[in-house]
Each structure stands twice: as structure tokens, then as C-alpha cells.
């Protein structure tokens, strides 16, 4: 019997990028038989990839024992005898290049993502303001170059995971619909002003028909506490649920509201409707949540701020662009949310 191919998939970071890879890996395994897939990623992203049936994860401690060149060589030594026949590099970073070079010495072939840097540069400088290939398609192209069929249009969403019992320590068992709101972003230029988001939260909290579940991280804790104490029917998950438990909760949301950030992609993994709010970045760069309706996008006013997108990741923006997201009215956010909640 022919031995199965064994692909080492490399994607070390970040949450959003990892989440985008999930439906691609599902399609890869659904559409190609006799195939093993192992993902090398940061330890904390392990639960994201473990949602894909048939995928193994080999976590890399790139801030610890696998840090630097010496650490990457150690990581290679730990996994080199796992029978990998090819490598799909979805990251295209210095770290992934080191791993590929070491495996190439063993005769393991590899293919690497084309990030479309030139196209993205033209998008930012305004010479080509048009839709670029999605990141999911760029990931799929890597596997296609290795000879595999990956048709994202035939993706099949799996059944929702079972809700952990712990969820009901923060959420009551009632008939309320669950709205996830991830109001924060790594860069301020991608974050909807909190005073405007509060108007959205206030509207839905007072109806008594919804439970608002806020998502955030360590630096957001004080604001999460303040918001949950200021508005009824509003809770947060940080420190109350583990990341794995959050991943089990998200598929059960009726709606997710997110910036151009990871939580929107985590919800899209499970076909949860996602309303995305965009600041100085733009969905044309290819980071739109997987298979979400384009009408669920709320964009900052490009007529008033014509340099949008000022960067791909939101890390660069002119000083006078700090208020771009104030051109998205709370009313427009509320209307879009109600449209989806009542569909």
C-alpha cells in the first residue's frame, strides 16, 4: 500500500492568519485522500489548528527554547524524523525559511506563499485600488503548487463543538441571542472609538433580547470590566474562559462584531455572521473573513480620507487619520447588526 504523503505546514502567527488557514486545511483534507498534515505553529495557537479534524500540531516555543537560529535548529532536530514528505510554508518568514533550508538538506521539497507584496504596495500607494487575491486563496495556492486539489468554494463547515459547561458560569441559560463583540485591535488605527462602541452596546443591552459577550486580552482587562459593569446583559470572557473554551463558545454566537482583527476570522471559521469595521486598512488587501457576505462590511469614509488603505496591517497611518473610524456611525453598526440578527 502506498505510504501517505505527510505535509508539514508552517504558520507561526498570528491569530487571524491562523484562523484563515483553518478552512483551507479543511478543504485540503476533504478533497485529497491518504494525506497527513502537521502544523508547526506558536504554542498558544495550537487550539486553533486542533479544530481541524485530521490535523496534528507540533508547537514551537519561539520565545523560549526554540528562539533564534540555535533554537530553530533544535526545533528541526525534534521534528526531522516525523516522516514529512513536503513542506507548505504559509508564513514566508525568516524562521520558516530556516526550517525549509534544514529540511531541504534531507531532500524534502517545499512551496512558499506568494504574499503579493508588489500588488499590496500598489494598493497602499493608490496606483491600483482594486480587490486583491484573498489570503485564504494565497494559502490554497501553496498546496496547489505542491500538486493538491484545494477548491475553497466546496468548503464544508463542520458541526459546532459542544459548549463547555463552564460557559454557563458567565452566561445564563435563557432565550437571549448571543452577540460577540471584539471592540479592540492591536493598532489604534483599526479600533472603533470606544465611546461610539458603547452606544452600540447600550442599544442592545437595554432590549433584554440579547446577551453581549465581550472579547479582549490582558491589556483590555480594565475596559472590559468597566463595560460589563456599566451595561446590563454584558459579560466578558477574559480570565473566565481559556482560549480553548473561547474557541468552543464562538461557534455558538448568533453574531460577531469585530474590527479587522483575529476574532472576526475565528467566528468565520464556523460560519458565524461577522460584521467587520474597517479603519485605515481595507478588505481589498485580502484579509476579509472567510466566505462572509461583503455587505457585512462597514468602511471608513474614503472620500474624506482618500489615502485609505494607509497600510496593510494598520501599523502606519498619517497623524490626521486617527479619527477615520468616526465616519462609521453607531446607527449604521446597529442597523447592520439588527439586519443580520433578524434574518
Where would I find each of the regions flagged by the language model?
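Catalytic machinery of carbohydrate-active enzymes
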Residues: 1-343
Amino acid at each position: 500500500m502506498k505510504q501517505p504523503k505527510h505535509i508539514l505546514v508552517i504558520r507561526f502567527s498570528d491569530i487571524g492568519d491562523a484562523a484563515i488557514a483553518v478552512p483551507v486545511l479543511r478543504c485540503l483534507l476533504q478533497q485529497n485522500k491518504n494525506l497527513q498534515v502537521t502544523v508547526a505553529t506558536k504554542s498558544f495557537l495550537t487550539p486553533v489548528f486542533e479544530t481541524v479534524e485530521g490535523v496534528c500540531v507540533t508547537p514551537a516555543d519561539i520565545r523560549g527554547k526554540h528562539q533564534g537560529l540555535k533554537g530553530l535548529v533544535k526545533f528541526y532536530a525534534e521534528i526531522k524524523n516525523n516522516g514529512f514528505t513536503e513542506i507548505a510554508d504559509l508564513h514566508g518568514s525568516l524562521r520558516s525559511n530556516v526550517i525549509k533550508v534544514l529540511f531541504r538538506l534531507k531532500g524534502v521539497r517545499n512551496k512558499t506563499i506568494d504574499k503579493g507584496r508588489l500588488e499590496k504596495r500598489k494598493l497602499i500607494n493608490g496606483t491600483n485600488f482594486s480587490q486583491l487575491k484573498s489570503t485564504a486563496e494565497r494559502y490554497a495556492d501553496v498546496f496547489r503548487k505542491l500538486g493538491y486539489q484545494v477548491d475553497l468554494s466546496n468548503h464544508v463547515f463542520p458541526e459546532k463543538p459542544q459548549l463547555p459547561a463552564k460557559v454557563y458560569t458567565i452566561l445564563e441559560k435563557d432565550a437571549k441571542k448571543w452577540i460577540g463583540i471584539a471592540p479592540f485591535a492591536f493598532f489604534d488605527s483599526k479600533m472603533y472609538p470606544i465611546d461610539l462602541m458603547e452606544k452600540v452596546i447600550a442599544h442592545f443591552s437595554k432590549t433584554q433580547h440579547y446577551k453581549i459577550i465581550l472579547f479582549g486580552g490582558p491589556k483590555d482587562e480594565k475596559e472590559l470590566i468597566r463595560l460589563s459593569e456599566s451595561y446590563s446583559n454584558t459579560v466578558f470572557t477574559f480570565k473566565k474562559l481559556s482560549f480553548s473554551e473561547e474557541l468552543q463558545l464562538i461557534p455558538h454566537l448568533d453574531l460577531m462584531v469585530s474590527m479587522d482583527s483575529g476574532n472576526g476570522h475565528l467566528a468565520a471559521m464556523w460560519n458565524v455572521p461577522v460584521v467587520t469595521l474597517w479603519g485605515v486598512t481595507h478588505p481589498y488587501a485580502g484579509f476579509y473573513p472567510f466566505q462572509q457576505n461583503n455587505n457585512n462590511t462597514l468602511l471608513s469614509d474614503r472620500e474624506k480620507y482618500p489615502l485609505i488603505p494607509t497600510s496593510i496591517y494598520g501599523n502606519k497611518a498619517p497623524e490626521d487619520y486617527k479619527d477615520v473610524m468616526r465616519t462609521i456611525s453607531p446607527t449604521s453598526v446597529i442597523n447592520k447588526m439588527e439586519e443580520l440578527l433578524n434574518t
